[in-house]
Amino acid sequence: MSNMLEKARKYETEKIAATDPQTKPLFHVSAPTGWINDPNGFSFYDGQIHLFYQYHPYNREWGPMHWGHSVTCDMIQWEQLPAALAPDEEYDKAGCFSGSAIEADGKHVLVYTGVTRIKQPDGSEQDRQNQCIAFGDGKDYQKYDKNPVMTGEMLPEGCNRVDFRDPKIWKENDTYYMIVGNKNENQIGQVVLCSSKNLTDWKFETILASNESGKIGTMWECPDFFQLGSKRVLICSPQDMKAQKYEFHNGHNSVYFLGDYDEKTHTFVKELPHALDYGMDFYAPQTTELPDGRRIMIAWMKSWDACVIPNSQVWQGMMTLPRELELKDGKIWQTPVREIEKYHKNPCRYDHAEINQETTLCGIEGRTIDLTVLLEEDEFQTFSMKLAANKEYETSFTYHKAENMLEIDRTYCGVTKDVVCVRKLKISNPEGLKKMRFILDRQSIELFLNDGEQVATTAICTPLEAQKIYFYSDKKIHINVEKYGIVKL
């Protein structure tokens, strides 16, 4: 173990012991200390689900990237393991950037982007991003002594050799494949496909997909590629997108393409892109397939456009609740992993409750809850809910029936900087909004609309004493409400 990795492990152990768990999410992965962003290496190995992540343990800001490490058996209760990687080699001294993991010959293999800096003729330095591997046993990892295994110089002419990062690996038959985010010489985002027979000798295969229209941002970060039902799915997180109506917002997005893939010719014919999440805090998703066949996705529950936390908080960054993916009606539907139901306690239910003007319902409150609201067809035109609320704080969700539009507003959630606080989304179902399922976990609200046809994720900075939930309707409406507290076993 290098001195740098040993130092990081010692530091995080000391800081974790000094951190009050009440200041952190109850059932979401969060930074053990310092900063985390992209999920990495989401995989099943040796009977456990492993999640790594971009990690700077020493303060709350992005810095030289390490890989943090957590494991779980049910995706609700997570165990913190020691940091897995540190930027301690010449080829990754500027950071161990994002990547993925796979099991091979009994070993847990991490594939990541090592960043180094090359001196230029004018004396300046320029980043170089190359792909590297490390072999481990689920806790300790040894970097391959001939890293990097693939460099930008191995890409064909026309490919950018500076931005070449975030490998996602899988195996088909007897061949390993990885897709890597890239740009072409005109700064247009694309994903390249590479292959290997042995994990150490890689070659370029093809450009799997690119931003031909020029409308899907610039660099395509954190790509993922997998089968879901009858379709192949490409996920990526484009930088610097322009807003497109209510589907995509300005800045960093996470999108998916459905399509058909020919494994022999490595041709992916993609359909139109869709947003994966319509909230304000969702980026760099990564998926894995569990032994039971479920495709599970997790993402960074923050955004480069809105990284705001209270000054009193000594950590920065958390992940979404893992979500089950399903292909339905030509789109990806998402639902919270079913394991959350094992932690349901203290149920509270209302059937056909009448709402007219603003009101509360006894027992319907809390900050670690699973809350479902069914809207009945009624006279209303505007229906709204305020969560994590009291006289000073609130995060509101307002449905405008005539426009079939949902407006999310966290202006009064406790943020102290001028970041994105309002977002509108068009409800996909032409029959309107029928069902809302909220997952609250102290610093976050995840909203699953119409059984997961759309999802909106929002981080909040609200003090925990703001526990109330308010309901409002401009005219009479009847709702069914079901709330469970979430209590860890």
Please tell me what each predicted stretch does.
Residues 1-166, 171-216, 227-278, 301-350, ...:
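Beta-rich carbohydrate-recognition and catalytic domains
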Residues 9-15, 254-489:
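Beta-rich accessory regions
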